[in-house]
Amino acid sequence: MSSVKVAVRVRPFNQREISNTSKCVLQVNGNTTTINGHSINKENFSFNFDHSYWSFARNDPHFITQKQVYEELGVEMLEHAFEGYNVCIFAYGQTGSGKSYTMMGKANDPDEMGIIPRLCNDLFARIDNNNDKDVQYSVEVSYMEIYCERVKDLLNPNSGGNLRVREHPLLGPYVDDLTKMAVCSYHDICNLMDEGNKARTVAATNMNSTSSRSHAVFTIVLTQKRHCADSNLDTEKHSKISLVDLAGSERANSTGAEGQRLKEGANINKSLTTLGLVISKLAEESTKKKKSNKGVIPYRDSVLTWLLRENLGGNSKTAMLAALSPADINFDETLSTLRYADRAKQIVCQAVVNEDPNAKLIRELNEEVIKLRHILKDKGIDVTDVQETPGKHKKGPKLPAHVHEQLEKLQESEKLMAEIGKTWEQKLIHTEEIRKQREEELRDMGLACAEDGTTLGVFSPKKLPHLVNLNEDPLMSECLIYYLKEGVTSVGRPEAEHRPDILLSGEAILELHCEFINEDGNVTLTMKPNASCYINGKQVTTPTVLHTGSRVILGEHHVFRYNDPQEARQSRHNLAAIAEQPIDWKYAQQELLDKQGIDLKADMEKKMLEMESQYRREKVELEQKMYHQTREYESMIENLQKQVDLAQSYISGGGSIWEGERMLTSSLLEFPEELKWTSDQKRVVLKAAIKWRYHQFTSVRDDLWGNAIFVKEANAISVELKKKVQFQFALLTDTMYSPLPPDLLPPGEDLTLRPYPKTVVAIQVQDLKNGATHYWSIEKLKQRLEAMRDMYETDAEMSPADGDPMMDALMGTDPFYDRFPWFRMVGRAFVYLNNLLHNVPLIHKVAVVNEKGEVKGYLKVAIEPVQKDEVINQKKGVRQTAKLHFRKEDFLKSHKNGETSDSDALAFPEHMQEEVEFCFRVVVLQAIDVADTYSDVFCQFNFLHRHDEAFSTEPMKNSKSPLTFEHTQNLHIKMSKTFLHYLHHFPIIFEVFGHFQPKSEQFNFERQNSALGRRLSTKLTFQQPSLVISTPVKSKKANAPIQNNNASVKSKHDLLVWFEICELANNGEYVPTIVDHAQGLPTHGIFLLHQGIQRRIKITICHEKGELKWKDCQELVVGRIRAGPEWAGGDDVDVLSLGLFPGTFMEFSMDDRTFFQFEAAWDSSLHNSPLLNRVSNYGDQIYMTLSAYMELDGCAQPAVVTKDLCLLIYARDSKISAASRFCRSLVGGISKSPEMNRVPGVYQLCLKDGSDSGSPGAIRRQRRVLDTSSAYVRGEENLGQWRPRGDSLIFEHQWELEKLTRLQQVERVRLFLRLRDRLKGKKNKGEARTPVSPCDPVCAIPESIKLDEKDKGIVGKVLGLIRRKIPMNKDPPTGNKAQELSDESGSNSITSPVSDKSLIKSSRSSDLLCRQKSKSDQNLASNDDIVDNLGGMKRSLSGSRILQLNILVPEVLEERVGVVVSKKGYMNFLEEKTQGWTRRWVIVRRPYILLFRDDRDLVIRGIINLANARIEHSEDQQAMVKVPNTFSVCTNQRGFLMQMMPGDEMYDWLYAINPLMAGQMKLHGNQNGTTLKSPTSSSSIAAS
């Protein structure tokens, strides 16, 4: 038994104590240490210790150095360790008292080394000086820290942050999975100690700049193995040296600890307090005389005391070193340390020599294992597969708690036995594996470790040849550089039997793929059998010497470049030549494909064509199938409806309900038999159905009447702004001479499926300033009209000096102008290729006709077959050659019932053979009688199916007539049924273009005769780009809303919508991002976002209480990311549907309006848009469109709220500077209030009657379209006699179509006449009989037809209708008088087809030109569909519905509040639903009154729609409310009493709100009791 040896050491003053002019309060006299408290009015205390070290001043003769401390404490403890005892040295004291300095010191300075380095040095010095060969020494070390009551392994980088502390009945407390390193020298210990010290937790406090924030325990296990030659047995002695560096106790007010430092200090004080309690308890136990009643010692209260249990009163020789601060400011801490040390002297330890503990432990552990196995076996548990790691058992039935505890003890014992039984060599191998693991982690971090283990860096090859990986995907690159060492470097897969040097993966890589042999400075590639290897794109099978810069491809995807530094230095000129083109992965792959003769582009194009063909074919099949099913279901519904109507009529006529139900039940089970129609009847019915299905007379008239007001308003604004642009209606029909452009067609309409041409109502835009004519759709006019209105509103506020007058036209922001092409089309002509069927050349002179049916000239074209043996002589002009491809799916659409087309029955002529190439030429000879107003005339031609670049001639100056082109185009085609079909039915299209240069007299004459031209001027103003109201973004979930502009409106509601974008803040909440309102854009603000932060979009809908009931938001979609305000159109490919949170209704105490708010999570990276992913550049703005599909109670479809938002992306960590925030606040752009960080939007919700919706035909039958051409438009008086065209335009266009039809017929007849004459001349030469026509007639014409009485009656009626003249509308509602048409044209409508009767009976290809556009092989393409429709009509007739459901259809329109401010200022409000007056800032922008909180408020808080409001002002009203200067505004939902502020004029406010009422009041002298309601006309004018 021995007591704990205690020593104290007094350190010098530190810098903090010197700066505080502290006094020394400690004195050391021998082994007595006295603390003097008189200087600070406290008592003196003296203590006796085993050693008292005075290290206060180096010049003091009693100064104790580091060496002396070690010689008196460390040497003795090291001697005990060699004797076989467990020893422990731990330092105790407050923070900054010198504990770490005494224990560790400075390892690099021999004089300043602490106890631990000196002890380790002497340990190996004694081991090295051992001369006894029978004794072997082994040393293991472990290093851990206790930080915040958690144990951390400082030597193993892969260990977790918290190791478990366990207790064994034989070994006592130990740390599970603590790394023990085997060391062989003092240098190894120093390295491990340095690694551990780097991982320790230190921090700076006010008392110590490098304060230890954890307890460190450095353990050395010394094993002495002695071999006894007599007994041939090995005995071992184990001793454990525990060197403890405790963290210092501290006070928070002294150290200034906060946050994490304060938490660390609390845990440090907790463990040290527990250590003090343990010392006190052990001292008490040691001084007790009776040992029977042994008290409880709180070892387990702290991890530190639990691990040091053996060193405190256990099996250990323990020394405690108390470090003291001599300063008077640390008097209390020093006195506490002295008292702890004094108590520790009384602790008695029972140290024993640990002789040969392994044998004893192994035996005891083995007995314990056998005992536990028997216990578990008796309980029926199989422990043969017990795992090493405790707690990880195989899945099975849940074990009881005591059984689980015994099983865990068994695992612990087996684990300890395995660890004890490890040999010294195994421990060294384990240490080496951990060292390699550490180097591997460094290598994964991109660092290379040298062999000495000290140098870190990346080494570049200077002499060694190497392979550079060129893979384009970094994740597939394995390694970037492979070094080719001297000798053989093998390449293969990781699973090979002999691991290769270079590991590659992939299907084409063999287990042993190839070898690189580096001998005599040359590298040779040797491949294994069946290995795929390529050098510079060429496959090699024999050993090949590599040269620097060579491209090596192994397998299919592994591409390398071989580099030899020595060879590169010898031939730098070769490298310079190679450097002209970058050698990368793409270069090597392209080189490989070139060497193999693979044209990757051609293969891709071929596959794309096949996929497109398959897609079109499957699409047509699905559409046909869907159409059939739809028609069947509609027919069944109509039949059932008919039966219900019959039953109801029976009941209403007096029949019983029971009989009516019986009739209904029986009739539902019976269907009338279908009528048996003959083939002639089917043909007649089919023709009539097709005609009426595509008849457009009434729909075209409705479009003219309904949109006349828009054309008139556009012209009025054009005159007011002096834009030199005139707008007028125009009818365009899709014919061969006038094909419709895609932008004039309804979206998704396919003209190829129509048997008759399509006629659309367009807007003819005459740009009189540039002499150009454009055609707009009605929708485009409406969009441009919005911008025209904005331009008109802002024109009065802009000065003539605002910008360059031509900037708006050049930028394309002026809504009146479109860009016009340099070349204008003169006209079109068509040439058929029937002469090629007879192998004769033919020269055509065809008319060039424009879309108005006017002949603009003639074109001379030659079509000549080229014979196989013909020698092509080079003539003057241009000669080109091209190869054509004709695909069957471009022309032949199979019928729905699988019927074959007529092209399958066509036979090839003798000079044409299937799948054999056929050659002919097209020669454009001359253009005749082209007007001299066109210069640079050229002609281009193409086939109907080709959408590629057309064949074009060179432009010719129009200086003389005729214009000679002499352009020859040789064409090669592989003969097929498709091309043969084309020769029979389709022509080549010729288009003549020229630069239009009107004569000045002609241009001026046109301007003077124009009703608008007389009022146009040259004044131009610069207009900022306006933002057209966007259409809703297409939803992926909700159905697209069906708009019915003709349905009756049930109610209208004004909506105020706030849009917010919230970003995730540091506190975990979503905060609205800043909005800049100073730009004045139609978006009402710019959101200033940060890059890469989670966001949410918050939308709040506000409106007056009423019948509107919001259910929830079905979907919120965001898309159309763009850099400019206008959306260019196209498919919404970047649309993202956001994840929604449930919507909630919000209530406010002083506001009884309805507030509905919902949020959606928005991840902007999913748009894959560079505009949202990167930081915005200076001056850039990002625009996007969002649409919220809202579900309303009682509505059949969602209401769509659409808004365009403007964004700016800032860096993630950037903040708006104070200067910038101040500058923006001056102009009112940014406010600190979060209520300002939202963007408002004003909308009008119209609820329409859903029963009006139905098929287009039903809508047209139900609606009454009013002629809006007579409606008044502001500025109409400036238009003079101009009026929008009306019904007369339809008849004029009908005559134009008649002209085009006759021109087409004439040209077709001329073709056949030329061909017949040419064939007749050819036959005369051969003395053969000339037939009547070039080919035989399709069918014989009967000489007589017999008719019965019924047929004669029908023929008589038809002849009567033909002879009857249809009366013309002499007085159309609007426009000029219709021209009187001839009797022949009066019977044809816009879509009336031309007669099917052939003009030349003997010709097979005498189809009409208008049918060729629709593909003659699918003449009447929808025959089956219409037959199904007729079948449905035969089965049942539609009846009235039983129940008309009152379903509403919502329509939301964004209202752009005008920029003209009529009046603004403060007003007092008294609402009927609230109490008390409220002061608000009011801005009148007709037709709205905008309400704000004050004049600094940037967000609209409320709106009043003057179009639906009534203004009242009277003296009686003011007398009743007893408040002067008041008037009332009443809406459908609310009434406001508004009072002006002192100093304001009543007339000014009334004039701003209702000018008509103010004018009447002024006229009548302020009559009392005046109550006026705003008329509709004034409201509409104000709104426009």
Swiss-Prot record:
Tissue expression as described in the entry: Expressed in nerve ring, amphid commissure and ventral nerve cord (at protein level).
Family affiliation: Belongs to the TRAFAC class myosin-kinesin ATPase superfamily. Kinesin family. Unc-104 subfamily.
Q: A Pfam family matched by this chain, by name? A: PH
Q: Kindly give the PROSITE patterns that the UniProt entry links to this protein.
A: KINESIN_MOTOR_1, KINESIN_MOTOR_2, PH_DOMAIN
Q: Which residue intervals make up region (Disordered)?
A: 1366-1416
Where does the PH domain lie?
1460-1558
**What are the record's GO terms for cellular component?**
axon; axon cytoplasm; cytoplasm; dendrite; kinesin complex; microtubule; neuronal cell body; plasma membrane
Q: Does the keyword Protein biosynthesis apply?
A: no
Q: Where does ATP bind?
A: 93-100
User: Gene for this protein?
Assistant: unc-104
Q: Which residues form a coiled coil?
A: 425-445, 598-652, 777-797
Polar residues bias (residue ranges):
1376-1394
Query: Which BP terms in the Gene Ontology apply to this protein?
Result: anterograde axonal transport; anterograde synaptic vesicle transport; cell adhesion; cell division; defecation; feeding behavior; microtubule-based movement; molting cycle, collagen and cuticulin-based cuticle
Effect of disrupting the coding gene: Worms exhibit uncoordinated and slow movement.
Task: Enumerate the subcellular locations listed in this protein's record, separating them with semicolons.
Answer: Cytoplasm, Cytoskeleton; Cell projection, Axon
Q: What does this protein do?
A: Motor protein involved in microtubule-associated anterograde transport. Regulates the transport of synaptic vesicle precursors in the axon of DA motor neurons. Regulates the polarized sorting of axonal proteins. Essential for the transport of synaptic components during the synaptic remodeling of the DD motor neuron, probably downstream of cdk-5 and/or pct-1/cyy-1 complex. Required for the anterograde transport of neuropeptide-containing dense core vesicles along axons. Involved in necrotic cell death.
Query: Where does this protein have compositionally biased stretches of type Low complexity?
Result: 1395-1409
Please name the GO terms that the record assigns under molecular function: ATP binding; ATP hydrolysis activity; microtubule binding; phosphatidylinositol-4,5-bisphosphate binding; phosphatidylinositol-4-phosphate binding; plus-end-directed microtubule motor activity; tau protein binding
Q: Does the keyword tRNA-binding apply?
A: no
What is the species listed in this Swiss-Prot or TrEMBL entry? Answer: Caenorhabditis elegans
Q: Where is this region: Microtubule-binding?
A: 183-335
Name of the protein in question: Kinesin-like protein unc-104
